[in-house]
Amino acid sequence: TLLIENLIKELKSRGYSIATIKHDVHGFDIDKKGKDTYKHREAGAETVVISSKNRFAMIKELNEEIEFNDIIKLLLDKDIILVEGYKNSNLRKIEVYRSGVSDKIITPKEKIIAVASDINLNLENIKVIDKNSIKELADLIEKENEFKFEIYQ
């Protein structure tokens, strides 16, 4: 998450509009007990929208997970979409490898753009970048023909 935060800041400083997608395999709830939107959902609304002059959010109950490509379609007005998770998507990826956390590269070679790591890795035909080299990672994203790819952490 820290890597994505830093990439957002760097890419924004370069003038890009950014969207992010975070996949949570455990489920999540962003609503707060006691708030009107929470009460609407508790009363049975399957979809709740909250809107103001500065923000818009929609909470929708699902019977099955929404297709990844359908989420992407909602964000096509942005220059760059950074994705955390969705390791099985067809997008090309920058995989984050952390010593003590990762034990192997899990992204197939044909889908990998680079590995961002906190240790020196010797990977055949795969670019390895220090995960703290935000400018270099942003340069790589900027250089890619397709601005929409995934960062798997």
Please describe what each predicted stretch is.
Residues 1:
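Walker A/P-loop
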Residues 6-62:
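N-terminal phosphate/diphosphate-binding loop that engages ATP/GTP or pyrophosphate donors
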Residues 34, 64-67, 98-101:
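Charged helix-capping and loop-helix junction motifs
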Residues 41, 50, 74-75, 105-108:
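Solvent-exposed alpha-helices and their adjacent loops that cap or buttress functional pockets
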Residues 60-88:
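Phosphate-binding/switch loop-helix module in NTP-utilizing enzymes
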Residues 80-147:
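Phosphate/Mg2+-binding loops and adjacent switch elements
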Residues 149-153:
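C-terminal-of-GTPase-core extension/linker across diverse P-loop GTPases
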